[in-house]
């Protein structure tokens, strides 16, 4: 029994000893942390960290979910209407329907500017015109071009400007060109990308009447963006149809005659204006050289435009209203009336031509004596002086009247100011005076300047239109008109409005007897013994004046001729200028003679 107890006790003793050792070991481990922490504290700390991380994960997940929900609410509730509209816009489309410009016609209904059908190829914010042939080929390749925007864009029906009468009308009609940002200004709502607007001439001056009002088409498209259903259409409205004062046949005839004489004289340029002296209406206005304004109807190629701009003869320049030249002897119409108005000469005044006069050391001669060796023409009154274009008479007139009277009188007859024609680019010309000469040339006004001005020289500069205008005033009761270029505009709704109303600028201060005296001189100028020899034996009486104007320091001269007819009841004034043409009677007068002979013929 003791043995068994010993074994038991020994085992218990061993176990007890082992337990104590383990207990001691555990106790040592719990106190063995280098930080002085017990293992139990470490386990508890680790559990806390895990809990914090878990909470962070929960919060992060919740935040992400909350953001997602808020975004969903924003898109569906707040922005839902916008997206709905965008979706609708992707389904509903608006096309612009291009409105054609109004036609331009002459006073007899002849079409001078019309519209021919073309297509406009539009892609995004760009557009260009293509011919009907090109458009039809595209449609043949894919009919959807008219109902759907493809890789090349979409085709719309449009028109292109056509000028059927050629270069005779280029300066007066002008042309159209693609609109620019500068052109738009504050009127951007009236135009579309690629629109063409007037850039010159009547096309530019009457842009607001000629341009149409674009329409719109609202329609639905299917998933392939093919037109499915038309919702509504606002039809485009064509622009107003403009009737000009121009006589197309006269315009063409005058251009042909001017061109013929310019080529015959072997010079390069000139212009002519025909006017109704009773109303101021312009019947014809030509400038040479000219250009084909049809080339501007589509995008002009760089080389073609460069050729026009760099041409030394400047075919784009409208010489009738923008060119300024010394008037030479055609100005004697004005200086005669100014002299009579001043009282320094009268219908009874006679000056003796002895071939030359002296002003100090300076000699002034009569052109006839200088040119033909004749020394004198004897005694002349104002009518005979006009008929003979006698320089000596007008030198003496200038000495009697003085520069201030000539300057004031010139302005009274519309010189030195624009006539007011509604075409852009008109030049006012120049009536020189003391202040101008001192400022520009740094010279005083000399007495010789007055003599030169009296015969249309010195620094006096005029346009052909101004000469036509004062010729008309001398022909009809001294009334100076603002030239009129257009008469009526007709709209698609049937309305017809009178436009560009001609108005009197003023009635010049000339008594009827003075005007009669000057007109008598103009009548004699076209009869035997006068200077307008191409009109000798003309079938109807006319009044005319020649001019041969010196310029620069060369011996070249500009050729002038101005005439009104019939003499007793004038219905037309015609003024012709041939630059560097020589004598007015030799070069410019034949243009007028041939044109008026045709104009008054029974064939027309």
Q: Where on the chain are the PLM-derived regions?
A:
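Periplasmic/cell-envelope proteins involved in peptidoglycan metabolism and beta-lactam response
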Residues: 1-302, 324, 344, 349-352, ...
